[in-house]
């Protein structure tokens, strides 16, 4: 948008420059204005010496109207002005000195004055003349030498206003102007009336999750909800820790009677009985079918009979008529407990039950045997006479601070490992007069190194600490390297070497 505004401003400026150029090009050059003098009027003239307002008869006025042609970007410019013309010239022109310019050859007299214009005294101001003329003769053709530049004439008085010209025709409608610059922001209007309620808008996007609010107060206890659907089978839980040794509980009550076992196997069929003798009663007529009798009460359960001998299959009897369905009988009394059935097939493995409650803590057990506590430690220092020990050899720590287990050998200045395990070793060395390079050595292998670059009478401290695993029979000592043996000790400064067992390895 700023580029469009700049283009509009440049176009407007260009239009103004073009209008000004065309306006200056179409203006006619004014003729010199006559000067009123006190000379006597010419013959045939009228009027006294005070006729300064009359124009000379030889000069006339001509109204010139210039109309600008319409262009694509400029409007119509109509200019009307009154120009004074010389009676010798046909139209207003610029000054010229070329011989080719044409002028009328006839002689103009005072009779050419405009009607109603009186003859007055006047004198031409030659400094404003465009042609080589004089008062007594008309100009002649030809090109004269250029004259010298005359002095500027006095300021002329403003002439009378000319006759207003006729109203010109309405010009063609110009093209629409460029868009103007945006106006300033208007004043804030009054608050309008409340509009009608709009339709419900689309639901907005969910906002950003706000910060978690403070924990609310405990609400009232809700009503018991409906029983939910059974949950899915959970994963197998971890094996619980064994409970404490609890006391033996009392004997429980007798459990409920278990369900009846499966039916026993069918016993072998007994032998057929002997056929009975025919009765004496002759065969009577077949009687009518009697009504179905009421079901009798269930009889007592019979005793289990002895298994019969395998008999032969008898002849199948005639198919009897189907009797009517009897009404169900009443519930009989529970029979006695039958003998236990055979052991059934083992069922599938049941699911793991919930973790039971923790058992009661059992009684305190008897005191065990006291374990043998393994100890191994030492702490030694350096006497002042053993300061600056020779390099490459164990430092002679002969000032015993602790060595109850006698695992430190003062003759060799070495620690002998008796109990395998993890040991802690540390040393604090006072350094003076010369630099120090010390190393913690295990079986001839340097495991830990320390360096302190010190010269002069300054005193410094060098220390280190490490955990090392040792086997039975390992030896540990401290030694200096090369000529950097600035180990120092005095009545006010000590250099110490300490070690102790942290964890002993379990016995095999």
From Swiss-Prot:
GO biological process: otolith mineralization
Keyword field contains Cytoplasm: no
Tissues expressed in: Selectively expressed in the sacculus where it is localized to the otolith, the gelatinous layer of the otolithic membrane, and part of the transitional epithelium.
Region (Disordered): 24-94, 142-371
Major localisation: secreted
PROSITE patterns: C1Q
Keyword Signal assigned: yes
SUPFAM superfamilies: TNF-like (SSF49842)
GO CC, alphabetical: collagen trimer; extracellular region
Bias-annotated ranges (Low complexity): 170-182
Known glycosylation sites: 121, 416
MF GO annotations: calcium ion binding
Biased composition, class Basic and acidic residues, residue ranges: 188-197, 212-226
Post-translational modification: N-glycosylated.
Gly residues: compositionally biased ranges: 42-54, 326-341
Signal peptide interval: 1-25
Keyword list, A-Z: Calcium, Collagen, Disulfide bond, Extracellular matrix, Glycoprotein, Metal-binding, Secreted, Signal
Entries under InterPro entries matching the protein: C1q_dom, Collagen, Collagen/C1q_domain, Tumour_necrosis_fac-like_dom
Subunit annotation: Homooligomer; disulfide-linked; probably forms homotrimers. Interacts with otomp.
Similarity section: Belongs to the OTOL1 family.
Domain notes: The C1q domain mediates calcium-binding.
Name of the molecule in the record: Otolin-1
Organism whose genome encodes this protein: Oncorhynchus keta (Chum salmon)
């Amino acid at each position: 948008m700023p580029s469009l505004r700049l283009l509009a401003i440049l176009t407007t400026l260009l239009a103004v420059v073009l209008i000004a150029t065309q306006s200056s090009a179409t203006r006619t050059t004014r003729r010199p204005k006559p000067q009123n003098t006190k000379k006597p009027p010419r013959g045939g003239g009228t009027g006294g010496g005070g006729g300064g307002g009359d124009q000379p008869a030889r000069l006339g006025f001509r109204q010139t109207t210039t109309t600008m042609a319409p262009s694509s970007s400029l409007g119509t410019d109509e200019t009307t002005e009154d120009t004074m013309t010389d009676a010798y010239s046909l139209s207003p022109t610029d000054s010229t000195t070329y011989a080719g310019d044409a002028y009328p050859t006839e002689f103009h007299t005072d009779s050419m004055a405009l009607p109603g214009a009186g003859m007055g005294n006047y004198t031409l101001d030659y400094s404003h003349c465009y042609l080589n003329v004089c008062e007594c003769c008309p100009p002649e053709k030809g090109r004269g030498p250029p004259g010298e530049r005359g002095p500027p004439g006095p300021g002329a008085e403003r002439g009378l206003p000319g006759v207003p010209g006729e109203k010109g025709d309405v010009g063609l409608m110009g093209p629409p102007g460029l868009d103007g610059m945006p106006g300033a922001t208007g004043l804030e209007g009054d608050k309008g009336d409340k509009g009608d309620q709009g339709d419900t808008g689309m639901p907005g996007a969910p906002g950003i999750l706000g910060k978690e609010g403070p924990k609310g107060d405990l609400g009232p206890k809700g009503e018991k909800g409906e029983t939910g659907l059974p949950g899915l089978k959970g994963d197998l839980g971890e094996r619980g820790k064994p409970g404490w040794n609890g006391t033996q509980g009392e004997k429980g009550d007798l459990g409920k009677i278990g369900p009846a076992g499966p039916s026993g196997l069918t016993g072998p069929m007994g032998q057929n009985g002997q056929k009975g003798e025919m009765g004496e009663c002759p065969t009577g007529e077949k009687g009518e079918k009697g009504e179905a009798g009421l079901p009798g009460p269930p009889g007592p359960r019979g005793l289990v009979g002895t298994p019969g001998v395998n008999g032969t299959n008898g002849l199948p009897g005639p198919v009897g008529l189907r009797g009517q369905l009897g009404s169900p009988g009443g519930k009989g009394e529970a029979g006695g407990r039958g003998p236990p059935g055979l052991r059934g097939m083992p069922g599938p493995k049941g699911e793991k039950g919930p973790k039971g409650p923790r058992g009661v803590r059992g009684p305190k057990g008897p005191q065990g045997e006291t374990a043998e506590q393994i100890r191994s430690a030492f702490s030694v220092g350096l006497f002042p006479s053993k300061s600056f020990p020779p390099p490459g050899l164990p430092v002679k720590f002969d000032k015993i601070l602790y060595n109850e287990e006698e695992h430190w050998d003062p003759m060799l200045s070495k620690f002998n490992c008796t109990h395998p395990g993890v040991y802690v070793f540390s040393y604090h060395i006072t350094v003076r007069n010369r630099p120090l390079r010390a190393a913690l050595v295990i079986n001839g292998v340097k495991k830990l190194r320390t360096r302190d670059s010190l010269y002069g009478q300054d005193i410094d401290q060098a220390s280190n600490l490490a955990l090392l695993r040792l086997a039975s029979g390992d030896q540990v000592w401290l030694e200096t390297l090369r000529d950097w043996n600035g180990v120092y000790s005095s009545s006010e400064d000590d250099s110490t070497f300490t070690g102790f067992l942290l964890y002993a390895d379990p016995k095999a």
